[in-house]
Structures are given as structure tokens and as C-alpha cells.
Amino acid sequence: GEINSLVADPAETCARVERHYTDAALSITRVDGLSMEFSDWRFNLRASNTEPLLRLNVETRGHDELLREKTEELLRIIRKEHSDRTEGKALGRPAA
């Protein structure tokens, strides 16, 4: 499901994620946020239009462990700006 993260600067956070994965990506599109595809997995990261949130969707080709690994990896990159702060914690609940 979709995972929301509170971020101060959605555009910069998307750019940071893109820089991290760009060399390994098979394709990159920016039609609805940032979508990157790899051999066994892909993700879409898009900004909310109404809140300071990024919404993350990660998919794999049936590899549950890879799904968990890549989701955790992406969330560490996305939420990096909040790692030293106690206020404005990232939201880890799925979107309704």
C-alpha cells in the first residue's frame, strides 16, 4: 500500500531519491511524481497536493523480502531530513 512521509521539501527529497537510484534504474519517468523501474522492482514517489507529504508505492515481482528491503531503504532516504529531529516525525501509516 501507499506509505506517507512528512517532508519539509518534497522536490528536494524526490531529487535525493532519484540521485541515489539513477545509475541502477532501467527507466525513469516523472509524469505522476517520480517513477523508477529496475529489473525486479519499481517505485513511485509523488507529492500530495494538499499536505507536505510524499506518497510512496513500491512493487516487486512477487519477492516479499525484496519488497521489505527496498521499502525500508527508500524510507531511510526519504525520512533522512527528520532523523535528528523530534518534531515533525514521518508518518508511517498507509493512506486511506
Predicted stretch roles:
Residues 1-57, 62-96:
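Phosphate-binding and adjacent anionic-ligand microenvironments
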